[in-house]
From Swiss-Prot:
This is Zinc metalloprotease Rip1. One of its GO terms (molecular function) is metalloendopeptidase activity. It comes from Mycobacterium tuberculosis (strain ATCC 25618 / H37Rv). Residues 121-203 form the PDZ domain. Keywords: Cell membrane, Hydrolase, Membrane, Metal-binding, Metalloprotease, Protease, Transmembrane, Transmembrane helix, Zinc. Belongs to the peptidase M50B family. A probable intramembrane site-2 protease (S2P) that cleaves type-2 transmembrane proteins within their membrane-spanning domains. Cleaves PbpB (PBP3, FtsI) near 'Ala-102' and 'Ala-103' in response to oxidative stress; cleavage is inhibited by Wag31-PbpB interaction. Probably also cleaves anti-sigma factors RskA, RslA and RsmA but not RsdA. Regulated intramembrane proteolysis (RIP) occurs when an extracytoplasmic signal (possibly oxidative stress) triggers a concerted proteolytic cascade to transmit information and elicit cellular responses. The membrane-spanning regulatory substrate protein (includes anti-sigma factors RskA, RslA, RsmA, and PbpB in M.tuberculosis) is first cut extracytoplasmically (site-1 protease, S1P), then within the membrane itself (site-2 protease, S2P, this entry), while cytoplasmic proteases finish degrading the regulatory protein, liberating the effector protein (ECF sigma factors SigK, SigL and SigM). One of its GO terms (biological process) is proteolysis. Its main location: membrane. Changing E22G: No effect on PbpB (PBP3, FtsI) processing. Gene3D superfamilies: 2.30.42.10. The chain crosses the membrane at residues 1-21, 104-124, 313-333, 373-393. Its cofactor is Zn(2+).
Length: 404
């Protein structure tokens, strides 16, 4: 029951985020003197609407987005006589950019507010975790039977049998110096047989010989970064866990921006990798193992939201919602039509072009002809809709689950 409740709550949270995105456009458009004709949540047939002043507000049947209709967003629109002077395309560049940025800016603001609240209530990941290969726990070596799923095992592992303890710092594996846990794990994966491992304990270097055990792990294959099963070495250790850090009202502010900055970098990497994930999504639809690194749709996001609520992980629920708002902001700022970023690019181009013409003693040119940009816009739409259908299908037939 809580799983279903979580799905509904997260879907509602996404809808509210989209509605606030459109509110951002509407509020700034009004403040800069533009006319907002309609503000609707959802698509399809209208379920309810009312008119307040010059704006019609309403709710439509399909709760998968929303829109804010601003008069004269492009020069090809038909305008009523009272709208011509207030048409968006006739306004100063800074006003147009402000209106267009306000939507993604609202999603960014939601992300910052949520992360700030998390910093105060639950705490944020440690911004300065140990960079050395600190051992957190030792145990047996379990086979990774499927991606992310380990089989049961008992007894001590190779590291424990060799005397390695929690808190030890690994500095060398065989002839390979290591300065982080990832470097240590990579060196162990390439090793076999009895290997000397140097650890630091209470400031003293200790050499111990560890019998590397062969096991199966899912690791990147080096071609697009897709995970594939491979036989590698393992010694049965885990990295030391660093708990979250709680902040005060003022100290949470820089921490919030720092975490958001890190997330922004990761979102950029994820967007750049989208084309490489098509094959993994197709295989998942065909019954293959679903790579947890593949993109998800609103459906998949809601399922993950349901998992977090079902297990009482409200901090994960809100953090995931913050990430999703950051992703919405980043996607909408892509300099491609029909995204907000595409319209911003057109406005900036017109401004630069007219500045150059003015410097040459020429009058300002006519606004960009959006009809000529329609073919490129349709290509982007087809690619976006196609990718959305692919992710929705994968999320319906083979969703990413956090606790399975």
């Amino acid at each position: 029951m809580m799983f279903v409740t979580g799905i509904v709550l997260f879907a509602l949270a996404i809808l509210i985020s989209v509605a606030l995105h459109e509110c951002g456009h509407m509020w700034v458009a009004r403040r800069t003197g533009m006319k907002v004709r309609r503000y609707f949540v959802g698509f399809g047939p209208t379920l309810w609407s009312t008119r307040r002043g010059e704006t019609e507000y309403g709710v439509k049947a399909v709760p998968l987005g929303g829109f804010c209709d601003i008069a004269g967003m492009t020069p090809v629109e038909e305008l009523d006589p009272d709208e011509r002077d207030r048409a968006m395309y006739k306004q100063a560049t800074w006003k147009r950019v402000a209106v267009l940025f306000a939507g993604p800016g609202m999603n960014l603001a939601i992300c910052l507010v949520l992360i700030y609240a998390i910093a105060l209530v639950w705490g944020l990941p440690n911004l300065h975790p140990p960079t050395r290969a600190v051992i957190g726990e030792t145990g047996c070596v379990a086979q990774e039977v499927s991606q992310g799923k380990l089989e049961q095992c008992t007894g001590p592992g190779p590291a424990a049998l060799a005397g390695i303890r929690s808190g030890d710092v690994v500095v060398k594996v065989g002839d390979t110096p290591v300065s982080s846990f990832d470097e240590m794990a990579a060196a162990v994966r390439k090793s076999h047989g009895s290997v000397p491992i140097v650890v630091e304990r209470d400031g003293t270097a200790i050499v111990t010989y560890v019998d590397i055990e062969s096991t199966q792990r899912w690791i990147p294959n080096g071609q697009g970064g897709e995970l594939q099963p491979a036989t590698v070495g393992a010694i049965g250790v885990g990295a030391a866990r660093v708990g979250p850090v709680r902040y005060g009202v003022f100290s949470a502010m820089p921490a919030t921006f720092a975490v958001t900055g890190d997330l922004t970098v990761e979102v950029g990497k994820a967007l750049a990798a989208l084309p490489t994930k098509v094959g993994a999504l197709v295989r998942a639809i065909g019954g293959g193992q679903r790579d947890p690194q593949t993109p998800i749709s609103v459906v998949g996001a809601s399922i993950i939201g349901g998992d977090t609520v079902d297990h009482g992980l409200w901090v994960a629920f809100w953090f995931f919602l913050a990430q999703l708002n950051l992703i919405l902001a980043a996607i909408n700022l892509l300099p491609l039509l029909p995204f907000d970023g595409g319209h911003i690019a057109v406005a900036v181009f017109e401004r630069i072009r007219n500045m150059v013409r003015s410097a040459r003693g020429k009058v300002a040119a006519a606004p960009v002809n959006y009809l000529k940009l329609l073919p490129a816009t349709y290509v982007v739409l087809v690619l976006v809709v196609g990718y959305m259908l692919l992710t929705v299908t994968a999320d319906l037939v083979n969703p990413i689950r956090l606790f399975q």
